[in-house]
Amino acid sequence: MLTPTVRKFQYGQHTVTLETGMMARQATAAVMVTMDDTAVFVTVVGAKKAREGQDFFPLTVNYQERAYAAGRFPGGFFRREGRPGEGETLTARLIDRPIRPLFPEGFLNEVQVVATVVSVNPQVSPDIVAMIGASAALSLSGIPFNGPIGAARVGYINDQYVLNPTQDELKQSRLDLVVAGTDNAVLMVESEADLLSEDQMLGAVVFGHEQQQIVIENIKALAAEVGKPRWEWHAPEVNVALQRRVAEMAEARLGEAYHITEKQARYAKVDEIKESVIADLLAEDDALDAGEISDILGALEKAVVRGRVLRGEPRIDGREKDMIRALDVRTGVLPRTHGSALFTRGETQALVTATLGTERDAQNIDELMGERTDRFLLHYNFPPYSVGETGMMGSPKRREIGHGRLAKRGVLAVMPSQDAFPYTVRVVSEITESNGSSSMASVCGASLALMDAGVPIKAAVAGIAMGLVKEQDNFVVLSDILGDEDHLGDMDFKVAGSRDGVTALQMDIKIEGITREIMQVALNQAKGARLHILGVMEQAINAPRGDISEFAPRIHTIKINPEKIKDVIGKGGSVIRALTEETGTTIEIEDDGTVKIAATDGDKAKHAIRRIEEITAEIEVGRIYQGKVTRIVDFGAFVAIGGGKEGLVHISQIADKRVEKVTDYLQMGQEVAVKVLEVDRQGRVRLSIKEANASAAAGQDAPTDAE
């Protein structure tokens, strides 16, 4: 008999249900989490033993959205879900980041978390539900896990924080922030903001962490009721004697190596020391394990670097804690791109381009929550040569997708509205060198490239990565961290914004005990660094260029009567197709009659506008037009008078005298002046050559050209 255990609680404006024991009973743990009709089924499976020779923690998080959850069929030829989309990849990272640091040091058993969206309410995003589900499943599994965590989304509407805002509320919000943490520590923050202050951002983090405590309490209660016993796992014993011996042989040498400021030279020296120590120790005792020695050397390396920072000594590259590396900023570095910039900060460098396109270049995204169009794309590429390595090149990896989204968040708040700038914009950041904070270099480069392209952004933005080294009550916040400081530190804290406020905040914390005071110090220090970088950027370009690139399409907008849209499009799109081929332009028509003509050549755009005006012009009775004979029949001739309009010249209206045979007076393709006699209710046009000739003889209206 299936007997599920259910726990229900109120979480802000939503009701959350945790249910276990009903499905996937062969998994280590499984939980169905529902929040107002959005349901995510989360399973956890953990291997009882680590693989032989395993030297890292193999945690995998898979997040998958099923089309049936929204009552839809998947797109594509096969009509089934395929590889994860960008949104699914980002949500998988969102789940992974706060749970990864909560597994104990030395735990190397394989763990897989699978979150499947099985029902979706369009107003309730599944990401928070999936994070709660992962926390609950891990807490029930018995796998060594120092959780549970809670998760919350925080909005900022009418100067008030809003817990887990609906999708409609998010459209009015100046903030979209996700925070996750344990009962006493914040572990992860991901956000985008509309130029909020540092205090407002910190307040949102604290608010979200306080509100999610009810989630943690209910997961703990569920685990106490039906959770499996915690595995009898013990951390591998530390060989203290070997630790001492390694320290004797390597500590001083590693300290000297970390005085080498150039990254590649330092890495080479550190590798040389490690290889030497391992070889010497194995020569002394071949029963020793090279992997264990390598792990001890890694821990010693970390202690050496952290100790220097905590003692107030200069950092790896000789800087003080709040110093920014040397900056080099250049714009317009590529001749044919619409906008470009080369941003260099120390040994981190980004070549960033901006490309302008029309509305048809926008990305149409078919998501579980519905379809949407994205007019601003930012892509981040991290090739292996940027760190002096060889490697596979191909489609973007999870990290590249995540870094690209963070950089996009940093710039999004300053992008102009569609009405102010009707272009689709694509920014690409090519990381050509990397030694820490390449995503924030991408924010700086994107701002510069957009201004170089003439995109009227509201303000320049810059990004900075902060780090933290903390031992007990002693802590040091580092500005503009190197890759090593990121790897060996306790916090990665990235902030992007303008002079007026924050546009994006991302935080990943590896330890507990990060207080509000520490976060406040980091945010304030980041603001100073950001303003310094903006000052240097403004020396290169201090405002968007007054005009877009000569190689970019110029968009000209005109308005036509919505009833005339069908005339411009034509049967099966024939007219608009012919227009684009004839004029060499791109033409887009909206339902309200707005027509956008994009062309790199101004004369071509003017030609297209003139043709559209002709097509949509009303035929005036009594007006003379220059037309072309298109068809000859027994009772007269049909004459095209422009804009795809055609009228009949009856045989009696060809000449002043009686006409026996139409072809005696008119030939196919002949150009003639015609006067409009009548437009009937059905839109049929009656023309007269006879009347046009009479008017011309009397010196009346000159004929209007019809193309």
Swiss-Prot record:
Domain S1 motif: 622-690
Keywords recorded for this protein, A-Z: Cytoplasm, Magnesium, Metal-binding, Nucleotidyltransferase, RNA-binding, Transferase
Binding locations of Mg(2+): D486, D492
Catalytic activity: RNA(n+1) + phosphate = RNA(n) + a ribonucleoside 5'-diphosphate
SUPFAM superfamilies: Eukaryotic type KH-domain (KH-domain type I), Nucleic acid-binding proteins, Polynucleotide phosphorylase/guanosine pentaphosphate synthase (PNPase/GPSI), domain 3, Ribonuclease PH domain 2-like, Ribosomal protein S5 domain 2-like
EC numbers on record: 2.7.7.8
GO biological process entries: mRNA catabolic process; RNA processing
Annotated localization: Cytoplasm
Annotated ranges, domain KH: 553-612
UniProt superkingdom: Bacteria
Assembly with partners or alone: Component of the RNA degradosome, which is a multiprotein complex involved in RNA processing and mRNA degradation.
The protein's name: Polyribonucleotide nucleotidyltransferase
Gene responsible for this protein: pnp
